[in-house]
Amino acid sequence: MKSTCSILALLAALAWPAPLFAAVPVSSAALLQPFVDKHELAGAVAVVVDKDKVRSIEAVGFADIAGRKAMKADSMFWIASQTKPMTATAVMMLVDEGKVALDDAVEKHLPEFRGQMVVAEKDDAHTLLRKPTHPITIREVLDHMSGMPFMSALELPTHDIVPLAALVRSYAITPLVSEPGTRYLYSSAGINIAGRVIEVVSGMSYEEFMQQRLFSPLGMKDTTFWPNEKQAKRVAKSYRPDATKTNLAEFQITQLAYPLSDRTRRFPIPAGGLFSTAQDTARFCQMLLNGGQWNGRRYVSEASFKELTKRQTPASVKDSYGLCFAVGPDWFGHGGAQATSMEVRPAKGLATIWMVQHAGFPGEGGNAQGVFKTWALERFGK
Protein backbone atom coordinates (compact mmCIF):
# COMPACT_ATOMS: atom_id res chain seq x y z
CA MET A 1 0.00 0.00 0.00
CA LYS A 2 1.16 3.52 -0.57
CA SER A 3 0.30 7.19 -0.42
CA THR A 4 -2.73 8.57 -2.24
CA CYS A 5 -0.62 10.52 -4.73
CA SER A 6 1.60 7.61 -5.66
CA ILE A 7 -1.29 5.16 -5.99
CA LEU A 8 -3.15 7.57 -8.27
CA ALA A 9 -0.06 7.85 -10.44
CA LEU A 10 0.15 4.08 -10.57
CA LEU A 11 -3.51 3.75 -11.57
CA ALA A 12 -3.06 6.40 -14.26
CA ALA A 13 -0.17 4.38 -15.67
CA LEU A 14 -2.61 1.57 -16.47
CA ALA A 15 -3.61 3.38 -19.69
CA TRP A 16 -2.09 1.81 -22.83
CA PRO A 17 0.53 3.86 -24.70
CA ALA A 18 0.47 4.35 -28.46
CA PRO A 19 1.72 1.56 -30.79
CA LEU A 20 5.50 1.25 -30.81
CA PHE A 21 6.34 -1.64 -33.08
CA ALA A 22 6.36 -1.79 -36.87
CA ALA A 23 6.54 -5.59 -36.72
CA VAL A 24 5.22 -7.13 -33.52
CA PRO A 25 7.80 -9.45 -31.89
CA VAL A 26 6.66 -12.96 -31.01
CA SER A 27 8.02 -12.55 -27.47
CA SER A 28 7.98 -9.64 -25.04
CA ALA A 29 11.22 -10.80 -23.39
CA ALA A 30 13.44 -9.19 -26.02
CA LEU A 31 11.69 -5.87 -25.41
CA LEU A 32 12.03 -6.09 -21.63
CA GLN A 33 15.58 -7.41 -21.38
CA PRO A 34 17.21 -4.03 -22.20
CA PHE A 35 15.63 -2.55 -19.06
CA VAL A 36 17.28 -5.35 -17.05
CA ASP A 37 20.61 -4.91 -18.82
CA LYS A 38 20.63 -1.19 -17.99
CA HIS A 39 19.85 -1.91 -14.31
CA GLU A 40 16.54 -0.08 -14.59
CA LEU A 41 14.41 -3.16 -13.86
CA ALA A 42 15.39 -6.02 -11.58
CA GLY A 43 13.05 -8.55 -13.12
CA ALA A 44 9.45 -9.16 -14.07
CA VAL A 45 6.86 -11.80 -14.85
CA ALA A 46 4.51 -10.70 -17.64
CA VAL A 47 1.35 -12.63 -18.51
CA VAL A 48 -1.36 -12.24 -21.14
CA VAL A 49 -4.58 -14.25 -20.89
CA ASP A 50 -7.85 -14.45 -22.76
CA LYS A 51 -11.11 -15.89 -21.45
CA ASP A 52 -9.94 -19.49 -21.72
CA LYS A 53 -6.17 -19.76 -21.84
CA VAL A 54 -2.80 -18.21 -21.19
CA ARG A 55 -1.60 -16.53 -24.37
CA SER A 56 1.86 -15.62 -23.08
CA ILE A 57 3.86 -15.96 -19.87
CA GLU A 58 7.45 -14.77 -19.70
CA ALA A 59 9.94 -14.06 -16.94
CA VAL A 60 12.93 -11.76 -17.37
CA GLY A 61 15.72 -10.58 -15.12
CA PHE A 62 16.25 -11.49 -11.50
CA ALA A 63 14.19 -12.24 -8.42
CA ASP A 64 17.41 -11.69 -6.43
CA ILE A 65 20.15 -9.69 -8.13
CA ALA A 66 22.86 -10.26 -5.51
CA GLY A 67 22.12 -13.98 -5.39
CA ARG A 68 21.91 -14.17 -9.20
CA LYS A 69 18.55 -15.89 -8.80
CA ALA A 70 16.57 -15.69 -12.01
CA MET A 71 12.98 -14.50 -12.06
CA LYS A 72 10.67 -17.45 -12.82
CA ALA A 73 7.07 -17.85 -13.91
CA ASP A 74 6.16 -19.07 -10.41
CA SER A 75 7.99 -16.31 -8.52
CA MET A 76 5.85 -14.79 -5.78
CA PHE A 77 5.17 -11.12 -5.09
CA TRP A 78 3.58 -8.92 -2.48
CA ILE A 79 0.66 -7.65 -4.57
CA ALA A 80 -0.38 -5.11 -1.92
CA SER A 81 -3.39 -3.07 -3.09
CA GLN A 82 -4.26 -5.61 -5.76
CA THR A 83 -5.85 -7.34 -2.76
CA LYS A 84 -8.57 -4.68 -2.83
CA PRO A 85 -10.46 -5.91 -5.94
CA MET A 86 -10.44 -9.44 -4.52
CA THR A 87 -11.94 -8.16 -1.27
CA ALA A 88 -14.61 -6.26 -3.19
CA THR A 89 -15.44 -9.40 -5.18
CA ALA A 90 -15.99 -11.23 -1.89
CA VAL A 91 -18.33 -8.47 -0.69
CA MET A 92 -20.37 -8.80 -3.89
CA MET A 93 -20.75 -12.54 -3.28
CA LEU A 94 -22.52 -11.63 -0.05
CA VAL A 95 -24.58 -8.99 -1.86
CA ASP A 96 -25.73 -11.72 -4.25
CA GLU A 97 -26.77 -13.83 -1.26
CA GLY A 98 -28.83 -10.97 0.19
CA LYS A 99 -26.70 -10.80 3.33
CA VAL A 100 -25.54 -7.24 2.76
CA ALA A 101 -26.48 -4.37 0.42
CA LEU A 102 -24.13 -1.83 -1.11
CA ASP A 103 -26.14 1.05 0.29
CA ASP A 104 -26.30 -0.39 3.80
CA ALA A 105 -24.77 1.89 6.39
CA VAL A 106 -21.58 0.37 7.74
CA GLU A 107 -22.98 0.86 11.24
CA LYS A 108 -25.78 -1.61 10.43
CA HIS A 109 -23.20 -4.39 10.49
CA LEU A 110 -20.51 -2.77 12.65
CA PRO A 111 -22.27 -0.93 15.51
CA GLU A 112 -19.01 0.65 16.66
CA PHE A 113 -19.40 3.13 13.77
CA ARG A 114 -22.55 4.65 15.27
CA GLY A 115 -21.87 8.26 16.11
CA GLN A 116 -18.83 8.62 13.85
CA MET A 117 -18.02 12.29 13.28
CA VAL A 118 -16.57 14.35 10.44
CA VAL A 119 -14.00 17.15 10.65
CA ALA A 120 -15.75 20.51 10.19
CA GLU A 121 -12.76 22.77 10.90
CA LYS A 122 -9.13 22.08 11.62
CA ASP A 123 -5.98 24.10 12.14
CA ASP A 124 -2.90 23.91 14.34
CA ALA A 125 -4.86 25.14 17.35
CA HIS A 126 -8.11 23.20 17.19
CA THR A 127 -10.26 20.59 15.49
CA LEU A 128 -14.03 21.00 15.30
CA LEU A 129 -16.14 17.91 14.66
CA ARG A 130 -19.77 17.56 13.63
CA LYS A 131 -22.19 14.84 12.67
CA PRO A 132 -21.98 13.87 8.96
CA THR A 133 -25.03 14.24 6.72
CA HIS A 134 -25.31 10.44 6.57
CA PRO A 135 -23.40 7.43 7.92
CA ILE A 136 -20.80 5.92 5.61
CA THR A 137 -22.06 3.07 3.42
CA ILE A 138 -20.60 -0.16 2.08
CA ARG A 139 -20.56 1.35 -1.41
CA GLU A 140 -18.67 4.40 -0.20
CA VAL A 141 -15.93 2.43 1.52
CA LEU A 142 -15.44 0.35 -1.65
CA ASP A 143 -15.28 3.31 -4.06
CA HIS A 144 -13.22 5.56 -1.76
CA MET A 145 -15.99 8.13 -1.33
CA SER A 146 -16.52 7.52 2.40
CA GLY A 147 -14.29 10.31 3.69
CA MET A 148 -12.21 7.82 5.68
CA PRO A 149 -8.50 8.68 5.98
CA PHE A 150 -5.91 6.45 4.31
CA MET A 151 -5.12 4.51 7.50
CA SER A 152 -4.95 4.85 11.27
CA ALA A 153 -1.96 5.50 13.51
CA LEU A 154 -2.00 1.82 14.54
CA GLU A 155 -0.75 0.91 11.06
CA LEU A 156 2.44 2.95 11.11
CA PRO A 157 4.94 1.87 10.06
CA THR A 158 3.81 -1.78 9.89
CA HIS A 159 0.35 -2.60 8.52
CA ASP A 160 -0.20 -6.21 9.54
CA ILE A 161 0.46 -6.46 13.29
CA VAL A 162 -3.05 -5.59 14.54
CA PRO A 163 -5.99 -8.04 14.28
CA LEU A 164 -8.62 -6.89 11.79
CA ALA A 165 -11.42 -6.39 14.35
CA ALA A 166 -9.21 -4.19 16.55
CA LEU A 167 -7.90 -2.28 13.55
CA VAL A 168 -11.41 -1.51 12.35
CA ARG A 169 -12.45 -0.36 15.83
CA SER A 170 -9.66 2.22 15.59
CA TYR A 171 -11.24 3.52 12.38
CA ALA A 172 -14.62 3.88 14.09
CA ILE A 173 -13.20 6.44 16.52
CA THR A 174 -11.31 8.25 13.76
CA PRO A 175 -13.14 11.31 12.38
CA LEU A 176 -13.96 11.39 8.69
CA VAL A 177 -11.80 13.77 6.67
CA SER A 178 -14.70 14.84 4.45
CA GLU A 179 -18.46 14.40 4.13
CA PRO A 180 -19.37 10.94 2.83
CA GLY A 181 -20.08 10.90 -0.90
CA THR A 182 -18.48 14.27 -1.66
CA ARG A 183 -14.79 13.58 -2.22
CA TYR A 184 -12.66 10.76 -3.62
CA LEU A 185 -10.06 9.94 -0.98
CA TYR A 186 -8.10 6.73 -1.55
CA SER A 187 -8.51 4.84 1.71
CA SER A 188 -7.11 1.48 2.67
CA ALA A 189 -9.02 1.90 5.92
CA GLY A 190 -12.26 1.74 3.97
CA ILE A 191 -11.37 -1.57 2.34
CA ASN A 192 -10.34 -3.03 5.69
CA ILE A 193 -13.77 -2.02 6.98
CA ALA A 194 -15.31 -3.98 4.10
CA GLY A 195 -13.19 -6.98 5.07
CA ARG A 196 -14.50 -6.82 8.61
CA VAL A 197 -18.08 -6.65 7.29
CA ILE A 198 -17.36 -9.88 5.41
CA GLU A 199 -16.47 -11.51 8.73
CA VAL A 200 -19.54 -10.31 10.60
CA VAL A 201 -22.01 -11.06 7.82
CA SER A 202 -20.60 -14.45 6.78
CA GLY A 203 -19.72 -15.77 10.23
CA MET A 204 -16.27 -16.72 8.92
CA SER A 205 -12.90 -15.07 9.33
CA TYR A 206 -11.98 -12.85 6.40
CA GLU A 207 -9.12 -15.09 5.33
CA GLU A 208 -11.25 -18.25 5.55
CA PHE A 209 -13.94 -16.69 3.39
CA MET A 210 -11.40 -15.61 0.78
CA GLN A 211 -9.76 -19.02 0.71
CA GLN A 212 -12.95 -21.08 0.58
CA ARG A 213 -15.03 -18.89 -1.71
CA LEU A 214 -12.43 -17.42 -4.09
CA PHE A 215 -8.86 -18.70 -3.98
CA SER A 216 -9.42 -22.45 -3.72
CA PRO A 217 -12.21 -22.66 -6.32
CA LEU A 218 -10.17 -20.59 -8.78
CA GLY A 219 -7.10 -22.74 -8.20
CA MET A 220 -5.08 -19.81 -6.81
CA LYS A 221 -2.78 -22.13 -4.88
CA ASP A 222 -0.05 -19.56 -4.25
CA THR A 223 -2.26 -16.68 -3.13
CA THR A 224 -1.91 -16.23 0.62
CA PHE A 225 -1.43 -13.77 3.45
CA TRP A 226 1.22 -16.05 4.94
CA PRO A 227 3.76 -17.48 2.49
CA ASN A 228 5.05 -20.73 3.95
CA GLU A 229 8.75 -21.53 4.11
CA LYS A 230 8.89 -22.88 0.56
CA GLN A 231 6.80 -20.05 -0.86
CA ALA A 232 8.85 -17.41 0.98
CA LYS A 233 11.92 -18.59 -0.91
CA ARG A 234 10.08 -17.76 -4.13
CA VAL A 235 9.18 -14.20 -3.10
CA ALA A 236 11.11 -11.75 -5.26
CA LYS A 237 13.37 -9.23 -3.54
CA SER A 238 12.28 -5.59 -3.54
CA TYR A 239 14.25 -2.84 -5.26
CA ARG A 240 14.31 0.92 -5.57
CA PRO A 241 16.69 3.46 -7.11
CA ASP A 242 19.99 3.81 -5.29
CA ALA A 243 21.39 7.13 -4.08
CA THR A 244 22.73 7.95 -7.53
CA LYS A 245 19.35 7.24 -9.18
CA THR A 246 21.24 5.26 -11.83
CA ASN A 247 21.19 1.76 -10.34
CA LEU A 248 19.06 -0.51 -8.17
CA ALA A 249 19.29 -1.01 -4.42
CA GLU A 250 17.66 -3.91 -2.58
CA PHE A 251 15.50 -3.08 0.45
CA GLN A 252 13.14 -4.83 2.85
CA ILE A 253 9.49 -3.79 2.82
CA THR A 254 8.82 -2.05 6.14
CA GLN A 255 5.03 -2.29 5.92
CA LEU A 256 5.19 -6.03 6.63
CA ALA A 257 6.19 -7.96 9.75
CA TYR A 258 8.62 -10.86 9.51
CA PRO A 259 8.81 -13.81 9.19
CA LEU A 260 6.06 -13.74 6.59
CA SER A 261 4.84 -17.18 7.65
CA ASP A 262 4.07 -16.03 11.23
CA ARG A 263 0.32 -16.52 11.78
CA THR A 264 0.47 -15.44 15.42
CA ARG A 265 1.88 -11.92 14.97
CA ARG A 266 0.88 -11.15 11.38
CA PHE A 267 -2.76 -10.59 10.43
CA PRO A 268 -4.53 -10.50 7.04
CA ILE A 269 -5.11 -7.03 5.63
CA PRO A 270 -8.06 -6.82 3.19
CA ALA A 271 -6.68 -3.64 1.65
CA GLY A 272 -3.25 -4.96 0.80
CA GLY A 273 -1.92 -8.05 2.53
CA LEU A 274 -1.80 -10.71 -0.18
CA PHE A 275 1.12 -12.45 -1.81
CA SER A 276 0.50 -14.10 -5.15
CA THR A 277 1.94 -15.17 -8.49
CA ALA A 278 1.27 -13.87 -11.98
CA GLN A 279 -0.44 -17.14 -12.84
CA ASP A 280 -2.78 -17.03 -9.84
CA THR A 281 -3.69 -13.43 -10.56
CA ALA A 282 -4.35 -14.44 -14.16
CA ARG A 283 -7.00 -16.89 -12.91
CA PHE A 284 -8.76 -14.05 -11.12
CA CYS A 285 -8.58 -11.93 -14.28
CA GLN A 286 -9.99 -14.74 -16.41
CA MET A 287 -12.98 -14.93 -14.09
CA LEU A 288 -13.47 -11.21 -14.65
CA LEU A 289 -13.06 -11.56 -18.42
CA ASN A 290 -15.91 -14.06 -18.29
CA GLY A 291 -18.18 -11.62 -16.49
CA GLY A 292 -17.88 -13.14 -13.02
CA GLN A 293 -17.69 -16.82 -13.90
CA TRP A 294 -14.94 -19.25 -14.81
CA ASN A 295 -14.59 -22.92 -15.56
CA GLY A 296 -18.30 -23.60 -15.09
CA ARG A 297 -18.66 -21.80 -11.76
CA ARG A 298 -20.24 -18.40 -11.19
CA TYR A 299 -18.56 -16.29 -8.53
CA VAL A 300 -20.64 -13.11 -8.76
CA SER A 301 -23.85 -12.38 -10.65
CA GLU A 302 -23.87 -10.35 -13.85
CA ALA A 303 -25.39 -7.45 -11.93
CA SER A 304 -22.68 -7.59 -9.26
CA PHE A 305 -19.96 -7.84 -11.88
CA LYS A 306 -21.28 -4.67 -13.50
CA GLU A 307 -21.32 -2.89 -10.14
CA LEU A 308 -17.71 -3.89 -9.50
CA THR A 309 -16.39 -2.69 -12.83
CA LYS A 310 -18.44 0.39 -13.70
CA ARG A 311 -17.59 3.90 -12.62
CA GLN A 312 -19.07 4.59 -9.18
CA THR A 313 -17.50 7.97 -8.52
CA PRO A 314 -19.68 10.94 -9.58
CA ALA A 315 -18.92 13.01 -12.67
CA SER A 316 -17.94 15.90 -10.39
CA VAL A 317 -14.95 13.83 -9.22
CA LYS A 318 -12.03 13.46 -11.64
CA ASP A 319 -11.04 10.00 -10.37
CA SER A 320 -12.82 7.20 -12.25
CA TYR A 321 -13.19 4.34 -9.81
CA GLY A 322 -15.54 1.39 -9.43
CA LEU A 323 -15.77 -0.93 -6.44
CA CYS A 324 -12.04 -1.37 -5.83
CA PHE A 325 -11.23 -1.12 -9.53
CA ALA A 326 -9.76 1.81 -11.42
CA VAL A 327 -12.04 2.21 -14.45
CA GLY A 328 -11.08 3.54 -17.87
CA PRO A 329 -13.09 3.94 -21.08
CA ASP A 330 -12.45 0.33 -22.13
CA TRP A 331 -10.56 -1.25 -19.25
CA PHE A 332 -10.58 -1.81 -15.52
CA GLY A 333 -7.84 -2.95 -13.18
CA HIS A 334 -5.69 -2.14 -10.19
CA GLY A 335 -2.07 -1.71 -9.19
CA GLY A 336 -0.07 -2.41 -6.07
CA ALA A 337 2.51 -0.55 -3.98
CA GLN A 338 5.42 -2.47 -5.49
CA ALA A 339 4.40 -1.56 -9.08
CA THR A 340 2.44 -4.74 -9.79
CA SER A 341 -0.68 -4.38 -11.93
CA MET A 342 -3.55 -6.23 -13.54
CA GLU A 343 -5.64 -4.80 -16.33
CA VAL A 344 -8.73 -6.29 -17.97
CA ARG A 345 -9.98 -5.23 -21.43
CA PRO A 346 -13.34 -6.93 -22.00
CA ALA A 347 -13.81 -5.70 -25.58
CA LYS A 348 -10.46 -7.20 -26.55
CA GLY A 349 -11.05 -10.32 -24.48
CA LEU A 350 -7.61 -9.87 -22.91
CA ALA A 351 -6.06 -9.26 -19.52
CA THR A 352 -2.46 -8.38 -18.71
CA ILE A 353 -0.68 -9.15 -15.46
CA TRP A 354 2.59 -7.41 -14.62
CA MET A 355 4.55 -8.60 -11.60
CA VAL A 356 7.59 -6.78 -10.25
CA GLN A 357 8.82 -5.67 -6.81
CA HIS A 358 9.85 -2.07 -7.21
CA ALA A 359 9.40 1.12 -5.19
CA GLY A 360 10.38 3.39 -8.05
CA PHE A 361 12.74 2.88 -10.96
CA PRO A 362 16.00 4.44 -12.10
CA GLY A 363 16.20 5.72 -15.66
CA GLU A 364 13.43 4.49 -17.95
CA GLY A 365 12.52 1.42 -15.88
CA GLY A 366 9.04 2.71 -15.20
CA ASN A 367 8.29 2.45 -18.93
CA ALA A 368 8.79 -1.33 -19.04
CA GLN A 369 5.20 -2.07 -18.05
CA GLY A 370 3.85 0.13 -20.84
CA VAL A 371 6.13 -1.54 -23.37
CA PHE A 372 4.81 -4.93 -22.31
CA LYS A 373 1.16 -3.89 -22.45
CA THR A 374 1.56 -2.25 -25.86
CA TRP A 375 3.17 -5.43 -27.14
CA ALA A 376 0.36 -7.54 -25.68
CA LEU A 377 -2.35 -5.45 -27.34
CA GLU A 378 -0.62 -5.47 -30.73
CA ARG A 379 0.24 -9.16 -30.54
CA PHE A 380 -3.06 -10.56 -29.25
CA GLY A 381 -5.66 -7.79 -29.35
CA LYS A 382 -6.64 -7.89 -33.01
Q: What is each stretch, according to the model?
A:
Residues 117-330:
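Short, surface-exposed loop or secondary-structure junction motifs
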Residues 29-32, 46, 52, 78-106, ...:
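Active-site SXXK
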Residues 61, 312-346, 356:
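Short, Gly/Ser/Thr-enriched beta-strand-loop segments that form substrate-interacting elements
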